[in-house]
Amino acid sequence: MQQLAGDPTRIPLPGEPWDLESQAVAVRNVHRAELKALHDAASVGGQARLPIDYKLDFEKFESFDNHIRGAFMLLQLEAGVAAYQGDPAKCRAAQKTAVGLYLAIQGQPDLTGFLGANSQLSRLSSTLERLLPYSQWTESELSKLQQQLCSIDYRQQLKLAIAGECVTEVASYEQFYPLTNGSEIEMLRWSLFARQSLDNEWPVVLAQFQSMGAQKTAERKTRFRFSKLPFDVYAPFRNQLAASGAHAAARRSLINAGLAVERFRLRHGRLPATLAEVDTDLLERGQDEAIPLTDPFDGKPLKYLVQPERCLIYSIGDDQLDNGGDVDFDETWANHKGPLDMGFSIRR
């Protein structure tokens, strides 16, 4: 499907050349049964779970992740083809199902599932953003999308995943007993610290995880062979967990704000000059976000830029530095440049 798009991340927009359109349609048609199953499941609701046995079964994890990613890519293809062929109803339906699928994979009781679910939010955000001008959403439909996405509490999700990971890793130490004697205590201590840290706002969570990572890295230098095992698992991987949660919270806030701006345009016939101008009833409040326009990475308001072709809402992102709204990939990939900030744009 990536090859059919002619690019790793994009299906051409209406009016752009697409030599592989017929092949893309053929792929979509071959998978009609799978698409119907996804649409039916999303309309009913429910949860999709990785069959966890709390063992380090990486093949099972990879299989689950591949299936989830494949489902999102298939829906992305369907939405893109529908937009390209001027079928906004089918385009909206595919995006609604993608949101439903994203909700269904929340609450995974392990870190692999948590990280895998978060990775699909970027794909979902990109699809909503790029196809927004071609989907012909109503204000009520956009409001429902906001409500669905804002129903997720990422800090609680991460707490659950950490608890499950604790069970998995404590069990794995049995393979090396007695060389790992005492490692279980270290894992339980870290799990308690991590879950308690998540009672704070995201900027505090990030700082505390970084502090713990630095501490464990220093302690690791005093250990030898297998006795280093409990310290190996803490840093730097453990720091990425909080960053992943904050990344998902930021991405969701950007979608929420972006759809609110589009609803503002539907209501007032123009785009707002600032985010503060957006009617408060257009912004959905999330369970874990007291202020929907706050950047999880620094606790400050999300940034808003009015540019010649778009209005851009952006977060400073993982590096916690404001790079002025650097959210675009290098289209030529000459320098393999990725975006430094995270954004959601609305075409003017």
Predicted regions and their residues:
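Short acidic linear motifs
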Residues: M1-R348
